[in-house]
């Protein structure tokens, strides 16, 4: 039924809800999302979600935003990030998927509460509060805005959903209409959401947000560092493997259970070193880190 709703939307004459390429993406991503949801959603919840999704798609709830980004694809991408990369479960994911329909008054909070529960409704209402705060404030890099945002969000799950949404937007950055829009988003993310991700232990997400922020604010420097890393990748990987081998042997001899990994430091981190130490790329000694 949802597939039929999607097919009907693609027949719209003016700026179609789905291009042919987006339609293919939708079917693929929707199947992936359902596979993840099956692991923690009851059949009853899934059935209710499918019915509501069919309804809101048919009513063009997810339309395109001011940058032309498909709202439904963005929502599904955000839900995938929230579940697979952050670890959010039932209540948060249902709230994430139904937030926009509630905001557009296609579904009411009372209906959500009756269909699911009060906790889902609570998260949606807090997401609505934070959305309203954004609409009324332009100085997102001010300390006052941050305090208001945290007081409005109240629940850490709301903050985690917002981090997932910003990561999704940053990955879609090339679809933003102009450089100015990308720079505004990058500035907001580097000032607010990357530090938040770090504070909440989402280190991989924090690094990606910072790298993408640099990409959108200083593309020349980003490309320079990326190229240098690519040029030295083979020798660096060999050195990391050689470095790890004796440590791994000693840990195994001690009978310890462990996980040891080597990783190249992020582009953002390397850029900070270049600036602070005022040295050429070739003089950086610690391009990688070992984590045990």
Give the location of each predicted region.
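Short alpha-helical catalytic segment bearing the HExxH-like zincin motif
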Residues: 92-97, 162
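Nucleic-acid processing machinery
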Residues: 3-41, 51-65, 74-85, 89, ...
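Aromatic/histidine-rich interaction motifs
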Residues: 129
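Hydrophobic or amphipathic alpha-helical targeting/insertion segments
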Residues: 97-126, 202
């Amino acid at each position: 039924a949802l597939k039929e709703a999607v097919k009907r939307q693609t027949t719209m004459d003016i700026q179609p809800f789905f291009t042919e390429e987006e339609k293919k993406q939708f079917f693929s991503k929707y199947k992936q999302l359902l596979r993840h949801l099956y692991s923690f959603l009851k059949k009853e919840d899934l059935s209710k979600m499918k019915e509501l999704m069919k309804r809101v798609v048919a009513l063009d709830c997810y339309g395109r935003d001011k940058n032309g980004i498909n709202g439904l694809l963005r929502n599904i991408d955000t839900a995938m990030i929230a579940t697979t990369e952050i670890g959010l479960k039932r209540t948060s994911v249902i709230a994430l998927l139904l937030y926009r329909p509630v905001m557009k008054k296609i579904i009411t909070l009372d209906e959500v509460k009756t269909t699911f529960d009060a906790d889902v409704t609570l998260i949606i209402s807090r997401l609505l509060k934070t959305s309203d705060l954004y609409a009324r404030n332009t100085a997102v890099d001010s300390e006052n805005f941050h305090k208001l945002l945290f007081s409005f969000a109240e629940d850490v799950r709301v903050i985690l959903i917002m981090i997932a949404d910003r990561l999704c937007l940053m990955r879609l950055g090339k679809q933003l209409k102009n450089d100015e829009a990308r720079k505004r988003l990058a500035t907001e993310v580097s000032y607010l959401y990357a530090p938040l991700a770090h504070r909440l232990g989402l280190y991989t997400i924090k690094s990606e947000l910072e790298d993408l922020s640099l990409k959108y604010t200083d593309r020349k420097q980003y490309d320079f560092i990326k190229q240098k890393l690519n040029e030295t990748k083979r020798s660096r990987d060999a050195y990391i493997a050689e470095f790890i081998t004796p440590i791994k042997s000693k840990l195994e001899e001690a009978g310890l259970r462990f996980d040891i990994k080597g990783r190249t430091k992020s582009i953002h981190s390397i850029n900070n070193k270049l600036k602070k130490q005022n040295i050429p790329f070739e003089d950086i000694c610690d391009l990688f880190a070992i984590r045990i």
